[in-house]
């Protein structure tokens, strides 16, 4: 009986997740190109971090690189979301 309840809960969660993603896509459709939006987000993030870390020593300055992926590698962290066509990716930044 517990197994059946657990399976039903997992099935409910699995069905609910794609519905939420489809709802978010419908709400955030603005007509702008998605790749440009991701590039603007990455540029704004890098500019904000550069302003926060105004360091004169070149050895202490970091170069931040961001890319849109389905998952982030070790040493990267999720800094936002990217939208390319109908897919939602993670904005993974290293630096």
Curated annotation (Swiss-Prot):
Disulfide bonds join 66-93, 68-82, 72-92. Keywords: Antibiotic, Antimicrobial, Defensin, Disulfide bond, Secreted, Signal. InterPro entries: Alpha-defensin (IPR016327), Alpha-defensin_C (IPR006081). It comes from the Eukaryota. GO terms for cellular component: extracellular space. Highly expressed in spleen, and expressed at lower levels in intestin and lung. Residues 1-19 form the signal peptide. Transmembrane segments: none annotated. Belongs to the alpha-defensin family. Has antimicrobial activity. This is Defensin-A3. The lineage of its organism: Eukaryota, Metazoa, Chordata, Craniata, Vertebrata.
């Amino acid at each position: 009986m517990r197994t059946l309840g657990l399976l039903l809960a997992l099935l409910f969660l699995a069905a609910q997740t794609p519905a939420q993603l489809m709802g978010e896509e419908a709400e955030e459709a603005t007509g702008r190109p998605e790749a440009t939006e991701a590039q603007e987000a990455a540029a704004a993030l890098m500019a904000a971090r550069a302003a926060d870390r105004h360091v004169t020593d070149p050895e202490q300055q970091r170069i931040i690189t961001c890319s849109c992926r389905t998952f982030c590698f070790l040493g990267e962290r999720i800094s936002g979301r990217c939208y390319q066509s109908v897919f939602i990716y993670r904005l993974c930044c290293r630096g």
